[in-house]
Amino acid sequence: MYTDTIVAISTPIGEGAIGIVRLSGPEAFEIVDQLFKPFVKGNQKNKQLVYGHIVSGENVVDEVMVVKMAAPHTYTRENIVEINCHGGIIPLREILNLALNNGARLAERGEFTQRAFLNGRIDLTQAESVMDLISAKTKKGYDLALNQLEGYLSKRIKNLRNKLMTLMAQIEVSIDYPEEDIEEITYQQIHDDLLAIETDISVLLKNAQNGKIIREGLKTAIVGKPNVGKSSLMNALLKDSKAIVTEIAGTTRDLIEEFMNIGGIPIKLIDTAGIRDTEDIVEKIGVERSKNVFNEADLVIFMLNAAEPLTEEDLQIMSLVKDRHAVVLINKTDLESQIDENLINETLHDKKIIKTSMELEIGIGEVEKAIQEMVLNNEIVTSESEIVSNTRHIHLLETAYKNVCDAKKAVIDHLPYDFIEVDIKDGILNLGMITGESVEKDLLNNIFSNFCLGK
């Protein structure tokens, strides 16, 4: 348990109806008792909201509602106080400073949740899901984070880890007590147990890409040569004028990123600079960034200008698009067509090709539908509670999967039990790092530093 008491503003800084200053630690009640004067005298009950004033000496700082929550049945398993004041920056900072002057310490980023983890109320996957819950951009992302906060994924990971630990214990008995009258575990039994665990991990990894998209968004790059309508498409999809649209080629010189929601899936839409050879230094940097985004994108929207013949730049981009998940738009179909559609169909025969006109708003709905269909063929679901979505979890799960596969290979090769045990121990370690049962302090600090203050 901690010996110090922390304090932070838990609501966004700015103007609002209500702001919250939160304290947690052994002296939380005593510190607030020095600041809070209730309108009705008497002992404040646990989890009772009480009306009164925060005061500094004889001066009233703000009119507030205060709730005290006694350990261990709190978010951090420590005494917690939440002061509900007016939401302006002045009252919030005044109350924060009073708490600091009376013995509290300013909380680090994510320290309330870190204390909840270190005090055993939640494990590391649940702690990380708190930030996912706050930053969720769609209902599916929110539901996924909520399931993980409830501990569904944790139970699945812990169950896998316990199976490996049980198997390792059986192997160790066979190694350490060969002379005892104990039935020795066989290679076949070890193989069967490892195969079952391998299958369980592979099921989790199968859904991991879906989970990552739900959590982080489908990175979708709009690419094409300059002035084909990329910025117009982005504005049409967002139903807002985020990107500058002009007749001048090369207007977009930097990446423009915005999130949109299609069928409950967060789409990270990226309007790129037109890809072409240029002597303009600033535009050249934008083109290089566009190429990098193209390489990293989950989905590419490739735009062509129907009113012009195919250029060398079009053909160059087309050759890159062939091997990618892509939707092809032949834009400006309101103008007389000069483009070679036969060549496009031959080269990109396996791609969805849509004719559009940003000017007349033709084909926008079809583009949205195509994106939704491209999102893993509509296979993204959140009905399964144990979907893995966090990149850190996925990496550790992949490593644990390799550990189990290596152990199974050692069994097939009839290597000594000591060799098999090494890989099983590594698998236990990696699964434990997901839930926080085996994790280093530096990693914990790195994880919680990504949280907001007051959480």
Regions found by a protein language model. Give the residues of each.
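A glycine-rich (often HGG/GG-containing) alpha/beta subdomain
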Residues: 1-143, 147, 151, 327
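C-terminal-of-GTPase-core extension/linker across diverse P-loop GTPases
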Residues: 2-9, 13, 37, 52, ...
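Short flexible coil/turn linkers enriched for glycine and charged/polar residues
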Residues: 14-15, 57-61, 73-78, 110, ...
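Switch I (G2) and immediately adjacent beta-strands of P-loop GTPase domains
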Residues: 51-62, 66-70, 251-278, 296-299
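Glycine-rich, N-terminal phosphate-binding loop of Rossmann-like dinucleotide-binding domains
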Residues: 87, 237, 272, 304-307
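Conserved beta-strand segments of alpha/beta enzyme cores
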Residues: 105, 266-268, 352
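Generic enzyme active-site microenvironment
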Residues: 269, 303, 329
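Inter-motif core of Ras-like GTPase G domains
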Residues: 283-307
